[in-house]
Structure formats: C-alpha cells, structure tokens
C-alpha cells in the first residue's frame, strides 16, 4: 500500500483548515452527515417545543412530565430494540433501520397526523380529567390531551441521542484514526454551529410565511409542512452521505483498514449497568465530583428552561410567533457559540488554568439565572423601572431568559465540555474507561431526569409554574453551590493527579539515561 505523502501545515492553516487535500474524500461526507443530523436536531427541538408549549390546554408545565414519563422509558425501550437489531443486521443495514422510522414519522406528522389532530386527540375526556385532578397535574393531562404532539416530542428528543450520539459518533469513532480525529472532530464542532445558523434562519423563514397564507388556512400547519420537508430532505442527504462513505471511502485502504483500526483501539468501553455505575462512583471521589458537575449542569439548565418557555408562551401565544422566536434564538446561539469557541474557549484554559475554565459556566448560569428569576418573581414591582427601557417586564424576562440560555449553552460547548474531557487525562486507562462509562450511565441520565422530577414535585405542590418559581430559584442557587464546590475540590485532585502523572513520565524518561 502506498501512503500519501503529507506535508506539515502552516500556522494559519493548522488553525483554520487542518485537512490534507486527499482527505477531503473522507472528511467532507462526514462533515455533511454531521451537519444534516445537527440541522434536523435544531429544527426538531424548536418544533417540539412549539407544539407542546403552544398546544390547547398545554404549556411548559407538560415538558417535565414528558421528559420523565415518556422520553426516559422510550429511550430504554429503544436501546433494547437496538441491542436485538445489532445482533441481526449488518452495520450499514442497522443505520438505515434506525434512521428510516424517524423520517417516516416526520413525513406523516404534518401530512396525516397533524391535520387529523381534532379526531385523534381525546379533548372531552381530558376536560373531564382536568376537572377532577389537582392543578399541579395539568401537565400530565396535557400529554393525554395532545398525545400525538407528545409522540412528536419524544421522537424529536430521541433524534439527538440516537442519530448523533449513538449512530454518528459510533460510526465516526469506528472509521477515524486517532491522528485524524484530532483534526477532524474540531471541524465537526464548527459544523454543528454552522447548522445552528442555517436551521435558525430556516425556522424563521418557515414561521414568517403565515403572512402570505389565505384566510381559513392554518398558518402553523403550513409552517410545519415546510419544516418537516426540510427535515426529510436533510435526512435523505444524511443517508446518501452514509451510503457514499461505505461505497467509496471504506473501500479505500488509505482511509480505512479494519485490522489496523482494531489494533489502534485501546480496548472496548465497558458496558456498565446502573448498579455498577453507582458502585464505581462511590469508590472514586474524583469520578464522583466529575459526575456532580455533569448532573448540576443538566438540572440547572432544565430548571431555567421550563420557566423561560412558560414566559415565552405568555409573550407569544401564537405558534408561528413562538416558532419564529425559537428560530432566532437558535441562530444567535450558533453565532455566540462560534465566537466563544474561536476566541474565548481555549485561551481561558491556557491563560488561567483548568479551574477558571470549569467555573465560567456555573458563574454564567448563576448571574444570568438570578437576573431572570428576579424579573419573573418581582415582575409587578419592576414594571415602572422596566418601562423606562420602553418594554414590559414579561418581554424583558423573555429576552433575558434567551440571553441566559445562549450564554449558558455557548460556555458549555466551549469551556465546560473541554474541562470535563481534560479531567480524564491524568487518570490511568481503567479509570478513564470505567469513569466515562459510569458518568454516561448515571450523570447524563440524572441531569436530564433530575430537573424534570424536581419540577414535577413542585408543580403538584404549588399548582403552577408561576407559583413554584421562587422555590425553583432557591433550588437553583443550592445546585450551583454544589457545582462550584465540586469544581473547586476536583481542581485540587486534578492538579495532584496531573503532577503525579508528570512525575511518572519524567521517571520513565530518565530511566534509560541512568542505566
């Protein structure tokens, strides 16, 4: 096999485009796959929120119930089905078998299911149920009342974890060599943010078309068809890119040699069940502190997002207006994320160290969270002051909530994720592999469902999102305090572990010289 000669990159090119010309055959279709998956992820995320929050008899209070009672069980059921299919089908057939049902559902939803919603939804039964049950269970009744929208929400939520985390990264890690990954994966991160810009603009365009719709036609129905048409086209491009890679890249020995790839892998990641994960976390203070960071982020974002979306519905009760705002929100998340990743992320960690990088996200969530909750809780008292800015307390709460979300997510992508991955570096191979598996099973799941569970409990006790907001603010402060303490303690362990590893490396280097 002749190896293509690779010249070293210049400083500017190594920063902007660290790809050799002959590698374009591999990296461009992978980039396109990643772009399509993340484009769909944004369109589906914003659409599912619009459907559930804007549905009749529903609101943001339905989200915690859907996440806990529908998304988590469906994710478990999917993994069981996936495990069975992976033993029967080839890897290529498995990819199509997993992706196709999503696209079929997203094609049927705007053309068949949504137009028949009045027939399919048990509105009268839900009304009777709502009259009997306490106000805190309105979210649970809303799921039944709009069950087809809830089904859309579940599949949209699963798209991210299934197609991105499982199918794409599983495929990419299998076919990408370590020296390629160091260069390719950073580009995929930029691709994700470019897709945010594209999908954000697309959502705004589709949502604004209501102005040209004739009277008597449901404008959101038209927007929904356009959004899902874009999702289907993007999904088909994704499938075509995957097919092309299998046909043209994986048959080229320059890019893929199964035997060589197997040698390069340092052992498979152990599959840990929930019990094993808990035991491993309990035995390792280092991994436990790292898990607390992940759990704290998941809970904090969840607590603020649902309250923000409830304010958003009050400001934009019309589905098209709500969707247009979410499109703009996604667009600006992409813009800010790119700027922070390029000019802030790496520089903060390099100049100020791991701890500063790890503390930026919780401090950002704390400061913006305090301002947001203050505007929601003290809305009436602040109306005179807010009027000086030419707006209303509600609109200001919506804008501050959007800024809070954008900054929190941008710093998460640029700094939180980087410091989290850096924390694994000083660990030995077993700790790295088992620790990552434990955090994937426990921390990721607890972060998402923990916030939903807290909100469900408060909704049942308080009766509405407005009534529970002061308690949410107190819980947020408590969780952030745990986050800050955990990061500070982990920093001490990280520095000690790093020094120990450097000492071991220095001893290994000096051993041949002294002998």
UniProtKB/Swiss-Prot annotation:
CC terms in the record's Gene Ontology section: plasma membrane
MF terms (GO), sorted A to Z: ATP binding; ATP:ADP antiporter activity
Source organism, top-level taxon: Bacteria
Cellular compartment(s): Cell membrane
Membrane association type: Multi-pass membrane protein
Principal localisation: membrane
Key words of the record: ATP-binding, Cell membrane, Membrane, Nucleotide-binding, Transmembrane, Transmembrane helix, Transport
SUPFAM superfamilies, alphabetized: MFS general substrate transporter (SSF103473)
Keyword Transport: yes
Annotated TM spans: 24-44, 62-82, 93-113, 124-144, 149-169, 184-204, 226-246, 286-306, 329-349, 358-378, 383-403, 465-485
Pfam families given in the database record: TLC
Ribosomal protein as UniProt keyword: no
Family: Belongs to the ADP/ATP translocase tlc family.
Name of this chain's protein: ADP,ATP carrier protein 1
Gene: tlcA
């Amino acid at each position: 096999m002749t190896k293509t000669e690779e010249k070293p990159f210049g400083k500017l090119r190594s920063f902007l485009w660290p790809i050799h010309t002959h590698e374009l055959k591999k990296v461009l279709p992978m980039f396109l796959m990643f772009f399509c998956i993340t484009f769909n992820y944004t369109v589906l995320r914003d659409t599912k929120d619009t459907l559930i929050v804007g549905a009749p008899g529903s609101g943001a209070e339905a989200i915690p119930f859907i996440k806990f009672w529908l998304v988590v069980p469906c994710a478990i059921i999917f993994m069981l089905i996936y495990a069975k299919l992976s033993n029967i089908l080839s890897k290529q057939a498995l990819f199509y078998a997993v992706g196709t049902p999503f696209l079929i559902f997203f094609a049927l939803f705007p053309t068949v299911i949504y137009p028949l919603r009045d027939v399919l939804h048990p509105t009268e039964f839900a009304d009777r149920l709502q009259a009997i049950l306490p106000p805190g269970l309105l979210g649970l009744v809303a799921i039944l009342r709009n069950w087809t929208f809830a089904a859309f929400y579940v599949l949209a939520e699963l798209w991210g974890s299934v197609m991105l985390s499982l199918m794409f990264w599983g495929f990419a890690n299998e076919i990408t060599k370590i020296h390629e990954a160091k260069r390719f994966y950073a580009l995929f991160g930029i691709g994700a943010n470019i897709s945010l810009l594209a999908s954000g603009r697309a959502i705004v365009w589709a949502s604004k078309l209501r102005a040209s719709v004739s009277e008597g036609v449901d404008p959101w129905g038209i927007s929904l068809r356009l959004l899902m048409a874009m999702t289907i086209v993007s999904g088909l491009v994704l499938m075509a890119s995957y097919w092309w890679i299998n046909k043209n890249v994986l048959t080229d020995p320059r890019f893929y040699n199964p035997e060589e790839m197997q040698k390069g892998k340092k052992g498979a990641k152990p599959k840990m069940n929930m019990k094993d994960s808990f035991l491993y976390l309990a035995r390792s203070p280092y991994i436990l502190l790292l898990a607390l960071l992940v759990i704290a982020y998941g809970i904090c974002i969840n607590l603020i997002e649902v309250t923000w979306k409830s304010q958003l519905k009050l400001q934009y009760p019309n589905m098209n207006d709500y969707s247009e705002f979410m499109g703009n929100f996604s667009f600006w998340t992409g813009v800010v994320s790119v700027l922070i990743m390029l000019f802030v992320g790496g520089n903060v960690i390099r100049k100020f160290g791991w701890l500063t990088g790890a503390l930026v996200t919780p401090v950002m969530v704390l400061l913006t969270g305090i301002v947001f909750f203050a505007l929601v809780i003290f809305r009436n008292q602040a109306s005179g002051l807010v009027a000086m800015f030419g707006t209303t307390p509600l609109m200001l709460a919506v804008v501050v909530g959007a800024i809070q979300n954008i900054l929190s997510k941008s710093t998460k992508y640029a700094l939180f994720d980087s410091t989290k991955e850096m924390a694994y570096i000083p660990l030995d191979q077993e700790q790295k592999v088992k620790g990552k598996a434990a955090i994937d099973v426990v921390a990721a799941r607890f972060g998402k469902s923990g916030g939903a569970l807290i909100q469900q409990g408060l909704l049942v006790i308080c009766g509405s999102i407005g009534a529970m907001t002061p308690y949410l603010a107190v819980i947020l402060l408590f969780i952030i305090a745990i986050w800050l303490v955990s990061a500070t303690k982990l920093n001490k362990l990280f520095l000690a572990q790093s020094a120990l590893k450097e000492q071991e490396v220095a001893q290994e280097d000096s051993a041949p010289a002294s002998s």
